[in-house]
Amino acid sequence: MKMMDANEIISFIQKSEKKTPVKVYIKGDLKEVTFPETVQAFVNKKSGVLFGEWSEIKTILDENNKHIVDYVVENDRRNSAIPMLDLKGIKARIEPGAIIRDHVEIGDNAVIMMNATINIGAVIGEGSMIDMNAVLGGRATVGKNCHVGAGAVLAGVIEPPSAKPVIVEDDVVIGANVVVLEGVTVGKGAVVAAGAVVTEDVPPYTVVAGTPARVIKEIDEKTKAKTEIKQELRQLNPEK
């Protein structure tokens, strides 16, 4: 998987068309209303639903107010530069409520739990789990077979573009409510204890804890048993 360069992301945001998409329920004498091709209209003679850009739909509502009796607008963003990732082709388990922006890479058999937030340019390796309410900032990278605990934050780096992003190498376990600051690399097989604030690189196969996080020991068999990654949680339905 290739991490996006910060300047690529900045250019994408700069050049993208800023959108305010809405869903509008309408009621009235709709046979008298003409809808442009740029608006998706699922209507009958008396009611229907519209999908499209707010500026266009507002014009329709204003120009046809004598035919439209009532309407309700659903809107969750304004001048948005980055769409949500199309999840339909992703070979991973993604639970309801996860917010995943476009240009995020998700490896096969990864797991994204409820209310996790994944920003543009982030990379999640095969078989890694991002737990509930965890946040992966822009360009944060998680390797294979990792677990990022509930409420953990991997800080994002888009600006300044020269800054180094968070990199979590393979087989890492990050506990709940951990904060990993910009530029930190968490080495392969390491364990970060719950609640730690990681300000410096974590050596491979070590356990760190505290605020700021410090190495407290090397990985041993007891630690491996307590932080085992269960592949059963990452299995998908067999392809038909």
Curated annotation (Swiss-Prot):
InterPro entries the UniProt entry points to:
DapH (IPR019873), DapH_N (IPR013710), Hexapep (IPR001451), Hexapep_transf_CS (IPR018357), Trans_hexapeptide_repeat (IPR050179), Trimer_LpxA-like_sf (IPR011004)
| Keywords, alphabetical | Acyltransferase, Amino-acid biosynthesis, Diaminopimelate biosynthesis, Lysine biosynthesis, Repeat, Transferase
- Presence of keyword Transferase: yes
Which pathway? Amino-acid biosynthesis; L-lysine biosynthesis via DAP pathway; LL-2,6-diaminopimelate from (S)-tetrahydrodipicolinate (acetylase route): step 1/3
Catalytic reaction list: (S)-2,3,4,5-tetrahydrodipicolinate + acetyl-CoA + H2O = L-2-acetamido-6-oxoheptanedioate + CoA
Keyword Repeat among record annotations: yes
Q: Which Pfam families match?
A: DapH_N, Hexapep, Hexapep_2
Record GO terms (molecular function): tetrahydrodipicolinate N-acetyltransferase activity
Q: Gene3D superfamilies in the record, alphabetically?
A: Hexapeptide repeat proteins, Malonyl-CoA ACP transacylase, ACP-binding
Which EC number(s) does the record attach to this protein?
2.3.1.89
Which top-level group of life is the source organism from?
Answer: Bacteria
A GO BP term here is:
lysine biosynthetic process via diaminopimelate
Coiled-coil region list: none
Question: Which family, according to the similarity comment?
Answer: Belongs to the transferase hexapeptide repeat family. DapH subfamily.
This molecule's function is given as:
Catalyzes the transfer of an acetyl group from acetyl-CoA to tetrahydrodipicolinate.
- Alphabetical list of PANTHER family matching this protein: 2,3,4,5-TETRAHYDROPYRIDINE-2,6-DICARBOXYLATE N-ACETYLTRANSFERASE (PTHR43300:SF10), ACETYLTRANSFERASE (PTHR43300)
Q: What is this protein called?
A: 2,3,4,5-tetrahydropyridine-2,6-dicarboxylate N-acetyltransferase
* Source species: Bacillus cereus (strain ATCC 14579 / DSM 31 / CCUG 7414 / JCM 2152 / NBRC 15305 / NCIMB 9373 / NCTC 2599 / NRRL B-3711)
The uppermost taxa in this organism's lineage are: Bacteria, Bacillati, Bacillota, Bacilli, Bacillales
Source gene? dapH
